[in-house]
A protein has these predicted regions:
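HotDog/MaoC-like acyl-thioester-processing domains
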Residues: 1-22, 101, 106-216, 222, ...
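Catalytic-pocket segment enriched in acidic/His residues
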Residues: 277, 289-293, 297-344, 355-360
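Hot-dog-fold acyl-thioester-processing enzymes
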Residues: 2-101, 167-313, 377
Length: 378
């Protein structure tokens, strides 16, 4: 098959018009979430899937001694509670979806044993011109998360960019230089430096960080994620559930309901587009350098960086994340943060933190801004 032959669907004005009809319509007939409840196992699987061993999430006896009296779920656990918020986009069949960011506010902690319901709807469609694939549609969803007491726990937006796979592969320029580089290779010394950061990673825990001890310009400890491996991506999917990962009869039923979902593999078997996270060949067909990480995974790493810093008595109030590039297998991310300001609002004290995540070549992968509520000695 010639490389220039069209293999996948295009973004058309007709398909966009059909999708626009769904704006502000509640999403009801959709996949059930991976998790309904913050059980001990669900929370631990989620935390371990993002490489987070904080005992506040993973050790119920430890959590029982916290000021909440119970273990908590990490703020990013919301990704496991609603598929639409996690990138299960509707419309534009055969057009790829790249998860690209979130803007979330948390109102209450998620406690061990809490049960959740959610509401979600398509909020907007915004057209962009991109280096990755030319014409792209930013598909924005709004979601609300409620606990068993019908209390609003969190609310916010997430978005994917819908891109034409053929256009990205054949005419996209974003990764021209990356594709020309030699494959990354790590020496023992390279790995030793990465592993030293893991060894030094500090979980603040029960050593309370007070607002009086924080000032603008304070640096957060560098957090490393990687080197990226398919094994790591699968570890995340184990806690998150994936979007299209199904087996046997359930895989068949999914393709019966969504025939445009199946992309034949090298054996001629229709399989899901989520394979871009573990198959280099399909990743190349959609225009990326190699198999790459999940967007919700990377957003969760940014929140992990903040929860490590804030300690058990802090609370993440807000996080906005922009994903700027893919992290293919072999990449390593270095997450850094700095306190931008300290402020008071409604009688509570907050630190605003700006974050960046650069890969091993110094290329920007993520930028984010978070607000953390901290206790005061006063």
């Amino acid at each position: 098959m010639p490389e220039s032959q069209q293999r996948f669907s295009l973004i058309t004005d007709k398909s966009l018009a059909e999708l626009r009809k769904l704006i502000n319509v509640p999403i009801e007939d959709t996949l059930e979430p991976w998790c309904y409840e913050a059980t001990r196992d669900n929370v631990r699987h989620w935390a371990h899937g993002i490489g987070d061993d904080n005992p506040l999430w993973c050790d119920p006896p430890y959590g029982a001694k916290s000021h909440q009296g119970r273990a908590l779920a990490p703020p990013s656990f919301i990704f496991s509670l609603n598929r639409s918020f996690s990138g299960y986009v509707g419309g534009l069949p055969g057009v790829h979806a790249m998860f690209a960011g979130i803007d979330v506010t948390w109102h209450k902690p998620m406690l061990l044993g809490d049960q959740f319901t959610t509401k979600a709807w398509l909020k907007d469609l915004v057209e962009h011109n991109t280096r990755f694939a030319g014409r792209a549609i930013q598909q924005i969803y709004r979601a609300e998360f409620y606990n068993q007491n019908n209390e609003l726990v969190a609310e916010g937006d997430s978005w994917c960019f819908r891109t034409e796979r053929d256009t990205a592969r054949e005419r996209g320029t974003k990764y021209t230089e990356v594709k020309q580089k030699k494959p990354v290779f790590y020496t023992r010394d390279d790995l030793a430096k990465i592993f030293a950061l893991y060894e030094a990673e500090e979980v603040r825990g029960n050593r309370t960080r007070y607002i009086e001890d924080v000032k603008a310009g304070d640096k957060l400890q560098t957090m490393v994620k990687g080197p990226m491996t398919v094994t790591g991506f699968i570890a995340f999917a184990q806690g998150w559930g994936g979007l299209y990962v199904r087996a046997n009869k359930l895989a068949w039923k999914q393709l019966q309901k969504h025939p445009g979902l199946g992309i034949p593999n090298k054996f001629g078997i229709p399989d899901v587009p989520e394979r871009v996270h573990w198959e280099d060949d399909l990743a190349a067909l959609v225009g990326t350098p190699a198999a790459y990480d999940y967007g919700p995974e990377r957003c969760s790493w940014m929140s992990h960086h903040l929860t490590n810093w804030m300690g058990d008595d802090g609370a993440l109030r807000h996080l906005a994340v922009e994903i700027r590039r893919h992290n293919p297998v072999g990449d390593t991310l270095y997450i850094n943060g700095e306190v931008a300001r300290v402020f008071q609002e409604g009688g509570a004290h907050y630190a605003e933190i700006t974050q960046t995540a650069l890969n091993q070549d110094g290329e920007l992968s993520v930028r984010a801004k978070g607000e953390v509520r901290l206790p005061s000695r006063a």
